[in-house]
Design a protein with these regions (language model features):
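C-terminal ends and interior cores of transmembrane alpha-helices
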Residues: 93-115, 312-329
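C-terminal transmembrane helical hairpin of 12-TM major facilitator-type secondary transporters
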Residues: 305-352
Length: 436
């Protein structure tokens, strides 16, 4: 009997080390890299260059490109890249091409000086955003198609682990290399983080897809199958519009908060080395702990309860930044705030991410997941890019971060309504996914 707890622990962690979830880990690393280079890392670089707050937060528009993924996701579901697709398969061919695009764009951005030509620098940032968004479409499709239904929770967790590892290594590595005086080297080195995803794709092979999606058809049929059918499939389900409303609003507060954080740290006087260690490094451990806890909570509490808990935690974590604004420059306070924020984000990434994956019909994986994941961030990115800088200047950081906490409430309330209405079932099924 004394071995029961050990067996329970082994049973809990075993799914994370199966082939599909391990592949998701490698894919997540690739996904997090471009995002890191145009999010917090770019904000630090611009703030350090003396660019005014309004212009710095406006660069969040480069991230807004991610929100338009559904516009070209159908192409990735349907279009075969000549020669390469015949050699390694459609999904893996797109993976190789999108990684080449992202590597070139990241390297270009690192070579430019924002003080010399801000417009060209912005164009390069948008190019990284487009390449990263394309890579995300491919990665999400491969990940979901690699995983069995019973692996979705572990697979979502490992994706979050990988994403945070990629963004951590890219972000912290960039800060440390830049501290030595070379942003170009910092950006060029980040492309090495794409290698694990290519290795995973080589080992696990081309994911299996429904035969109906692999056959060639005429243009009108292709448009219907790749654009109209995925949207109609999702939007005609019971409660789909309410689910979409939740997806649109639940991350507004968190997105607005996070896109201003590096600017906030710069104004508080934290050095690049302090941010790299206390924010990025210690934050990573908080996030990894959150991902692990998220997987356990998902398994023990069920889908609905775990998502609701994570929404509460993510909202409360925004208020912690208001506390840091009051305290000021204090590395221990920074470590505490980042630890809690990343813990909450890790839990939320697993639970909400698993729900979004379960909502996807495998016939339209790339298109539907691109729609859901981009909708989850579009309002927050648009709001923060257009008004965050002005709000910080007019409200100050304390009131600004209280505002981001309030912005998290609509998502909590909508999800609570969905849960009570029976549109989210706690036994790892989602009623809207079946149309029941």
């Amino acid at each position: 009997m004394v071995t029961t707890p050990n067996r329970s622990l082994l049973a809990a962690i075993k799914p994370y080390f199966e082939a599909g979830p391990l592949g998701a880990l490698a894919l997540g690393m690739a996904s997090g890299t471009p995002y890191a280079m145009i999010a917090a890392t770019l904000t630090t670089r611009l703030a350090e260059s003396g660019i005014e707050k309004k212009s710095v937060t406006a660069f969040g528009l480069a991230l807004l490109v991610y929100s338009f993924k559904p516009l070209w996701a159908p192409l990735i579901d349907r279009v075969r890249i000549p020669v390469l697709a015949n050699l390694i398969g459609q999904r893996r061919a797109w993976l190789v091409v999108s990684i080449i695009m992202a590597s070139a764009a990241i390297t270009w951005l690192g070579l430019l000086d924002p003080t010399a030509d801000l417009a060209l620098f912005a164009a390069a940032a948008v190019a990284v955003g487009f390449a990263g968004a394309t890579l995300d479409i491919v990665i999400d499709a491969i990940r979901i198609e690699w995983l069995r239904v019973d692996q979705m929770g572990a697979g979502s967790g490992m994706t979050q682990y990988g994403w945070r590892m990629g963004s951590y290594l890219a972000g912290a590595g960039a800060l440390l290399l830049a501290a030595g005086g070379s942003w170009a080297l910092a950006y060029a080195s980040a492309v090495l983080l794409f290698a694990p995803s290519l290795i995973a794709a080589a080992v696990l092979g081309e994911p299996q897809r429904p035969p109906a999606l692999q056959s060639g058809k005429g243009l009108s049929a292709a448009i219907k199958d790749s654009i109209i059918a995925p949207l109609a499939d999702f939007l005609t389900r019971k409660g789909a519009w309410i689910v979409l409303a939740f997806v649109l609003v639940h991350k507004i507060g968190d997105t607005v908060c996070q896109l201003s954080v590096r600017l906030f740290y710069n104004d508080l006087g934290f050095t690049k080395e302090e941010v790299a260690f206390y924010d990025v490094s210690l934050g990573l451990f908080g996030y990894l702990a959150g991902v692990f806890l998220g997987g356990l909570i998902y398994k023990r509490v069920g889908l609905a309860g775990s998502v609701f808990l994570s929404l509460i935690l993510m909202g409360v974590s925004n208020a912690a930044y208001a506390g840091l604004a009051i305290i000021g420059h204090d590395v221990w306070a920074l470590a505490l705030v980042q630890g809690f924020e990343n813990l909450a984000s890790g839990i939320g990434g697993v639970t909400v991410g698993a729900w979004l994956a379960l909502l996807c019909d495998r016939r339209f994986t790339a298109t539907q997941f691109a729609l859901l994941s981009s909708a989850a961030a579009i309002l927050g990115r648009a709001f923060s890019s257009g008004t965050a800088g002005a709000l910080i200047e007019s409200l100050g950081y304390v009131d600004f971060y209280w505002l981001t906490t309030v912005l998290a409430l609509p998502g909590v309330l909508i999800f609570l309504w969905l849960w009570r209405a029976g549109l989210v079932v706690a036994d790892d099924t989602v009623e809207t996914a079946t149309g029941a």
